[in-house]
């Protein structure tokens, strides 16, 4: 059995630290991609009293949130019409991505005789989604004056927040400042938000009315220097499995597909029942590390869909079937932390955690 053990205390402590750091700004907690792989329902259930909003990528994720909490939920992505009626009935916040979408929302709202809560996404330089910057004020004005929309928020997204010295950050901030000025001229109550985790840590003065700290809430820090208080944030999860078999190699034998790992006679290998079919990175095969009984062991051979093997050498520490295996550590400096795994596989912690799928059990402790 493969289990992602999540510390409720660490999760809640991370959010409390962030709330202290952002002052009076609201907190919108992103739980998209199954709460970055940690499990939407469990994460929402254990944090809803600490945050103001939740944010997700699509309608189906939003419904999973509203099933367990009453907080407002913002959908970042495009809304599919087969779900829009249920979204409106549950007061799920819709993102407006272009001017023309306002009229479509109004038509549906009239049919349901219910107003739609909306946030307008402005493209200030990410060039992915959102209303074009040059069309922003017209779109905001149109939505604000609509009889069928409640314009609750206006937001944008930083393209280069992970590089705090990138000139695009200033360009986007200046553009958003002009949008905020226009928006607040209509109503001081409209929530303006720009920053994700890297945004409000790397750029001073851009918390605005609300921040959206995703990866930081789950315990992953940017590499650049941040405030000492933020340094108290810790990863919330450990990925664990069990040794299911011990194999002793004979002379000249290898292990796994293509037998790329060739051991020595008498070498012992531990078989672990987790593989890329569980969302664990295949690239770790033959170069990653796991922790068994506080000893690090190297992976041996290619990772398969459902399993991997690690070399125990001569098994001087007497690893046995049934021993617990730590695949992802909650200690960032460890060789099997999400941070270290991301470095080894040339990706980011978001990727390592969010691709862990539902073959892995989530357990709040």
UniProtKB/Swiss-Prot annotation:
<dbReference type="InterPro" id="IPR029066">
    <property type="entry name" value="PLP-binding_barrel"/>
</dbReference>
<dbReference type="GO" id="GO:0030170">
    <property type="term" value="F:pyridoxal phosphate binding"/>
</dbReference>
<dbReference type="Pfam" id="PF01168">
    <property type="entry name" value="Ala_racemase_N"/>
</dbReference>
<dbReference type="InterPro" id="IPR011079">
    <property type="entry name" value="Ala_racemase_C"/>
</dbReference>
<dbReference type="Pfam" id="PF00842">
    <property type="entry name" value="Ala_racemase_C"/>
</dbReference>
<protein>
    <recommendedName>
        <fullName>Alanine racemase</fullName>
        <ecNumber>5.1.1.1</ecNumber>
    </recommendedName>
</protein>
<feature type="active site" description="Proton acceptor; specific for D-alanine">
    <location>
        <position position="32"/>
    </location>
</feature>
<comment type="similarity">
    <text>Belongs to the alanine racemase family.</text>
</comment>
<dbReference type="GO" id="GO:0005829">
    <property type="term" value="C:cytosol"/>
</dbReference>
<feature type="active site" description="Proton acceptor; specific for L-alanine">
    <location>
        <position position="257"/>
    </location>
</feature>
<feature type="modified residue" description="N6-(pyridoxal phosphate)lysine">
    <location>
        <position position="32"/>
    </location>
</feature>
<comment type="pathway">
    <text>Amino-acid biosynthesis; D-alanine biosynthesis; D-alanine from L-alanine: step 1/1.</text>
</comment>
<dbReference type="GO" id="GO:0030632">
    <property type="term" value="P:D-alanine biosynthetic process"/>
</dbReference>
<feature type="binding site">
    <location>
        <position position="128"/>
    </location>
    <ligand>
        <name>substrate</name>
    </ligand>
</feature>
<feature type="binding site">
    <location>
        <position position="305"/>
    </location>
    <ligand>
        <name>substrate</name>
    </ligand>
</feature>
<keyword id="KW-0663">Pyridoxal phosphate</keyword>
<dbReference type="GO" id="GO:0008784">
    <property type="term" value="F:alanine racemase activity"/>
</dbReference>
<dbReference type="InterPro" id="IPR000821">
    <property type="entry name" value="Ala_racemase"/>
</dbReference>
<keyword id="KW-0413">Isomerase</keyword>
<comment type="function">
    <text>Catalyzes the interconversion of L-alanine and D-alanine. May also act on other amino acids.</text>
</comment>
<dbReference type="InterPro" id="IPR001608">
    <property type="entry name" value="Ala_racemase_N"/>
</dbReference>
<dbReference type="InterPro" id="IPR009006">
    <property type="entry name" value="Ala_racemase/Decarboxylase_C"/>
</dbReference>
């Amino acid at each position: 059995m493969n289990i992602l053990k999540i510390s409720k205390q660490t999760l809640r402590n991370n959010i409390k630290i962030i709330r202290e750091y952002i002052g009076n700004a609201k907190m919108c907690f992103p739980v998209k991609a199954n709460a970055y792989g940690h499990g939407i329902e469990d994460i929402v259930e254990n944090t809803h009293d600490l945050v103001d909003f939740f944010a997700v990528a699509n309608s189906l994720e939003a419904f999973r949130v509203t099933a367990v909490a009453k907080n407002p939920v913002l959908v970042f992505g495009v809304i599919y019409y087969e779900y829009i009626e249920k979204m409106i009935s549950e007061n799920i916040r819709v993102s407006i991505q272009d001017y023309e979408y306002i009229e479509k929302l109004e038509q549906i709202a009239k049919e349901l005789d219910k107003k739609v809560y909306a946030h307008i996404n402005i493209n200030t330089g990410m060039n992915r989604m959102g209303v074009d910057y040059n069309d922003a004020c017209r779109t905001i004005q149109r939505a604000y004056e609509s009889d069928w929309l409640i314009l609750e928020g206006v937001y944008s997204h930083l393209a280069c927040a992970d590089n705090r010295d990138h000139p695009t950050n200033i360009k986007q901030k200046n553009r958003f400042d002009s949008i905020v000025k226009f928006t607040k001229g209509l109503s001081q109550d409209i929530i303006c938000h720009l920053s994700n985790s890297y945004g409000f840590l790397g750029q001073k003065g851009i918390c605005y009315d609300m921040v959206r700290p995703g990866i930081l809430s789950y315990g992953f820090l940017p590499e650049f220097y941040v405030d000492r208080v933020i340094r108290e944030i810790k990863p919330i999860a450990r990925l664990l499995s069990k040794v299911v078999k011990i194999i002793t190699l004979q002379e000249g034998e290898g292990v796994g597909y293509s037998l790329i790992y060739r051991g020595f006679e008498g070498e012992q290998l531990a078989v672990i029942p987790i593989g890329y079919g569980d969302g664990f990175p295949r690239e770790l095969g033959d170069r990653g590390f796991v922790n068994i009984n506080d000893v690090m062991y190297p992976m041996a051979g290619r990772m398969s869909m459902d399993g991997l093997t690690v070399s125990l050498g001569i098994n001087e520490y007497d690893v046995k079937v049934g021993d617990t295996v730590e695949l992802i550590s909650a200690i960032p400096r460890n060789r099997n932390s999400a941070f270290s795994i991301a470095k080894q596989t040339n990706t980011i912690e978001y990727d390592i955690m969010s691709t862990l799928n539902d073959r892995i059990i989530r357990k709040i402790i």
